[in-house]
């Protein structure tokens, strides 16, 4: 075990209390096969757990009296980690994809870029539509705004506009989010 720096706070045990760590004066005991034994003294419950070759695990510490169960703690921890990893797998990470346009983007290029926007929205990702102005194009910001409004109109069946087009330096940016799944 690694040494702890002298100024670090003591490590807190985050898991459920097990065996002799249970400090209640009496507990509600659930047996190894799930039957309710009743309210007993922790020492008696510990003796029953040792006799069965298992651990006494505090399941709900906030109940009165606290509920404890006779079970294999290693197996319980393993099952809990498995459940947590399954929950993490099911979470969808929403990424922000970026599609860049120019004020003079031609029809075919526009269609190709829009196909990408549709694909990203179908996958449940957000899309950041960036319109970059170069040199004297800054004088024609209205063309850029019209292009982004056209993009917004084309994606309204698949996504919703989260941020309306706004200027950031030499770029006009708009965020599109996917519609919630029904």
From Swiss-Prot:
Residues 1-20 are annotated as: Disordered. One of its GO terms (biological process) is ribosome disassembly. GO terms for molecular function: ribosome binding; translation initiation factor activity. Disulfide bonds: none annotated. Keywords: Cytoplasm, Initiation factor, Protein biosynthesis. It comes from the Bacteria. The keyword Chloroplast does not apply. GO terms for cellular component: cytosol; membrane. The keyword Transmembrane helix does not apply. SUPFAM superfamilies: Translation initiation factor IF3, C-terminal domain (SSF55200), Translation initiation factor IF3, N-terminal domain (SSF54364). It is found in: Cytoplasm. Belongs to the IF-3 family. Monomer. IF-3 binds to the 30S ribosomal subunit and shifts the equilibrium between 70S ribosomes and their 50S and 30S subunits in favor of the free subunits, thus enhancing the availability of 30S subunits on which protein synthesis initiation begins. This is Translation initiation factor IF-3.
